Amino acid sequence: MPRIALDLNREADRQKVKGQWRLGPGLVPGEPNEGLVAQILNTPARLAEYDDSKWEICNNIRQSISKGFTFAWYRIAVTLPAEIDGVALTDSRVYFETNVDNYGEIWVNGKIDRATGVIIGINTQYRVEVMNKAVPGSKHIIACLVVNGPLAEPVGGIFMRYATLAFESRN
């Protein structure tokens, strides 16, 4: 099965899908106390139509940010190309693969697959389907919530170890 993998931390690879990472601190970026309130039912940052245009641009998802009990969202919009390096991508399976420190959630187009989109634990690799059959020109929003842990005594900061957009041919 031929595979093409783009490292979404590399500018050259992000350009192939017209992507740019944005970083929004907090569970609900821009809200008082970063949106941390008792019994919150959801956060709009997970939704595809959420406006992240005022968030800072993040050119290095591997850079550790913050300290202590922290939440942040990493979001990227990608547009699937017809080909990469001469290889046609139509009908390929498309996956987003990542590893975050410590807990995370992966939302694709405003939805989460609770079986594959919840990251529990440091150094755990995760892979979620973006699209079963690639359609050139289709746009997808990938939103990753990252949380530092353990929650009662967090150490270090938050970051994404890697983020890959993979295209796997059916042939």
What are these language model-derived features?
Residues W107-V128:
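Solvent-exposed beta-strand/loop surfaces of large extracellular or lumenal domains
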Residues A82, V100-N102, I120, N132-A134, ...:
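Short, flexible loop/turn elements at secondary-structure junctions
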Residues F69, L89, G121-N123, A134-G137:
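Surface-exposed coil/turn segments at beta-strand junctions on protein surfaces, enriched
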Residues L47, W55, T70, V78, ...:
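Aromatic-lined ligand-binding clefts that engage carbohydrates, nucleic acids, or primary amines
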Residues I61-G68, R75-A77, D85, A115-V118, ...:
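Beta-strand-rich interaction surfaces with strong enrichment in secreted/lumenal proteins
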Residues A48, D52-K67:
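Surface-exposed, low-complexity/disordered Ser/Thr/Gly/Pro/Asn-rich loops and linkers
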Residues N102-E105, R114, G149-A152:
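Flexible loop/turn segments at secondary-structure boundaries
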Residues M1-L47, W55-I57, A134-N171:
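An acidic-aromatic loop/edge-strand motif
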